[in-house]
Amino acid sequence: MKLTCMMIVAVLFLTAWTFVTAVPHSSNALENLYLKAHHEMNNPEDSELNKRCYDGGTSCDSGIQCCSGWCIFVCL
């Protein structure tokens, strides 16, 4: 029983630690995450998940599509 409780506490601690280290260090980081998610729900065409090409300056190779259609080691 004690081992089970320790395992539950450890999992909760590691989950919280992962969340804390993944959020940008800002006093209103949670608010920013909420606003970004809310914006993407209202404007699904602006969502990063719908983007199928890479912006300029992103590294690329022959198999990756750039938004401009030009790839010379980086998207132009």
UniProtKB/Swiss-Prot annotation:
It is found in: Secreted. Keywords: Calcium channel impairing toxin, Cleavage on pair of basic residues, Disulfide bond, Ion channel impairing toxin, Knottin, Neurotoxin, Presynaptic neurotoxin, Secreted, Signal, Toxin, Voltage-gated calcium channel impairing toxin. Residues 1-22 form the signal peptide. GO terms for molecular function: calcium channel regulator activity; ion channel inhibitor activity; toxin activity. It comes from the Eukaryota. Disulfide bonds join 53-67, 60-71, 66-75. One of its GO terms (cellular component) is extracellular region. Expressed by the venom duct. Its main location: secreted. Residues 23-52 form a propeptide. Omega-conotoxins act at presynaptic membranes, they bind and block voltage-gated calcium channels (Cav). The presence of a 'disulfide through disulfide knot' structurally defines this protein as a knottin. Belongs to the conotoxin O1 superfamily. This is Omega-conotoxin-like TxMKLT1-0211. It comes from Conus textile. The lineage of its organism: Eukaryota, Metazoa, Spiralia, Lophotrochozoa, Mollusca.
